[in-house]
Every structure is written in C-alpha cells, then in structure tokens.
C-alpha cells in the first residue's frame, strides 16, 4: 500500500472515529437532559442524573457541556427539552433479534431513519412485541477488575442489596439486578469502597443465539449503521459471539 493511500485510509478512519465520538457525546448529553428534566438538577435526589453525569465524565465530555445539559434539562435556561423514548424491533442476519431504543424530538424522522438503516444493511423490521418478549429489563453495573480484587469480593458487597448475578467478563465484573434495586446495589458498592464504570437499565436477552463469523460481521454492520443515527440511544441484540469469532472481528478492526 502506498504512503498516500495509507494516509488517506488513516485520515478516513480518524474522521469516522471523530464523528462517532461527537455522536457519543450528543447521546450522553441527551441522557443528562432527560434525567434532569424528570428528576431535577439536584444530584443528591436524582441518582439517574448522577449516573448520566458520571458516564459522560468517564467519556471525557467537557464539564461545561455537562453543566449546560443539566440546566437545560431542568428548565433553568428557558429552553424546553421534549424527547420521546421509542422502541423499534427487528431482526438482523440469521434471525438475530434486535431492539433499537430511540430518544427523539421527531418520531417520524426516527422511524424513517431506522427503517432505512434496517433495509440497507440486511435487517428487517418486526411487529411491536414480536421481538421484545425475548428481552427483559435489568439493572446492569460494570465494575473494572482494577477496582475489585475478586468476583467473590463484588458478590459479597452486593448480594444483600438485591444483586441477582455477578459475571466475570475478563476486564470487568458485570452485576445484574432488578431496575428497582439499582440504587441499593450502587450504594453497597460505594460502602465497600468499590468503584464502578457504568450503571444502566438495559434490555437483556433471555436466550442468546450463537453466531458464526459471517453472521457476526453482518450483525455488526447493521449495529454500526444504527449507531450512526442521531436519534438512536441504545441497541440490544441476542447474539452470542464465541471467543474465536470475537478474535477474528478484532482482527477486522485492526486492518
């Protein structure tokens, strides 16, 4: 590969990374605005806002942007924040179930963009309820290995607070609980001196479908297309990617 074309490729990749970083910031800001609108700007009485702000800070969103988002959401700047949460259902390659969660101020735009992304990237839309039943809402808290000596330490800290399960995912321990127990589990971690990276309510698949490399690539292509949409906040799939397939996907990303 010539130096010129390599530079062009590098520049193109950097543009993609910068674009996705900007979109990530915008989505984090939306979460802060909505949390502040629902629960107010006072962090001490709004744990959802605390989580949204913490997540934004960990992703290096500037403090000025965070402060403005809190004030804007709480109505302190005279602006009206009016977002709707809408869930779209569909299937990726080989019947992999997909939920697409949107936070939008224009329902028609969101619907049109999700449908277009689905049809152009090998997915199909599904009727309401036909996919969602495969998932259930759970509180999901990620604790980095660096902040917790062992899985047993994490389990001991959160078991009495309502945690249902602790799983070791290599770099992080994942704690699952009922959404209503999230505050208690977070407090239990803090009391034990254990820091956490993120705490979110997610749609967790009840049954996962193991995928091969070709299917995983197709699913990732569709997920990437969805993540590029401004109105899309979260995407959930029920694919189970084996270690060897994930290694091959990681190699794809490095090329």
UniProtKB/Swiss-Prot annotation:
Q: Name one GO biological process term.
A: regulation of DNA-templated transcription
Q: Which Gene Ontology molecular function entries are recorded, alphabetically?
A: DNA binding
* Record keyword Cytoplasm present: yes
Would the keyword Ligase be found if you checked this record's keyword annotation?
Answer: no
Where does this polypeptide localize? Cytoplasm
Superkingdom per UniProt: Bacteria
Q: Which keywords accompany this UniProt record? A: Cytoplasm, DNA-binding, Transcription, Transcription regulation
**One Pfam family hit:** Transcrip_reg
- What cellular component GO annotations does this protein have? cytosol
Q: Which InterPro entries match?
A: Integrase-like_N (IPR017856), TACO1_YebC-like_2nd/3rd_dom (IPR048300), TACO1_YebC_N (IPR049083), Transcrip_reg_TACO1-like (IPR002876), Transcrip_reg_TACO1-like_dom3 (IPR026564), YebC-like (IPR029072)
Which family, according to the similarity comment? Belongs to the TACO1 family.
HAMAP family attached to this UniProt entry = Transcrip_reg_TACO1
Q: What is the protein named?
A: Probable transcriptional regulatory protein CMS0715
Instruction: Specify the species.
Output: Clavibacter sepedonicus
